[in-house]
């Protein structure tokens, strides 16, 4: 599926770019990133896993608002990230990392599948992802 198909299926909407909504998403991304690290230290692995994903989710949403998109499904964010990668604006690994984090979050929430290794890896990946989204946002 591509961006046009996501729009056609109602998974993504075109909206006017909105810096105010982007700023709110950045605040949430930063809060979630700090919380994911703290949860990992406390060995609260399920919550660290899910919160790392949400740090990525909010950072990506900040970029989407700048680009003039509002997501109606988490999957649509991955599609936009892949589109950005195909256009040379983002390394494909960040789109892949987002998808992997999305699956890890779903595993933790719905299948009670999580581990210290996954939580530790996601905290690291989320930190890199948020940093990369900030670079992309500034372009």
Residue ranges and their predicted role:
Residues 1-139:
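Terminal alpha-helical segments
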């Amino acid at each position: 599926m591509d961006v046009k198909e996501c729009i056609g299926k109602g998974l993504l909407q075109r909206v006017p770019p909105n810096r105010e909504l982007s700023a709110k998403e950045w605040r949430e991304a930063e809060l979630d990133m700090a919380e994911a690290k703290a949860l990992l230290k406390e060995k609260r692995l399920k919550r660290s896993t899910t919160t790392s994903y949400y740090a990525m989710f909010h950072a990506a949403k900040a970029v989407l608002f700048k680009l003039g998109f509002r997501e109606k499904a988490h999957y649509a964010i991955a599609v936009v990230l892949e589109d950005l990668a195909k256009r040379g604006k983002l390394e494909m690994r960040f789109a892949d990392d987002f998808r992997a984090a999305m699956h890890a979050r779903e595993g933790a929430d719905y299948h009670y599948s999580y581990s210290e290794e996954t939580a530790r890896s996601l905290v690291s990946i989320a930190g890199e992802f948020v940093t990369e989204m900030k670079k992309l946002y500034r372009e």
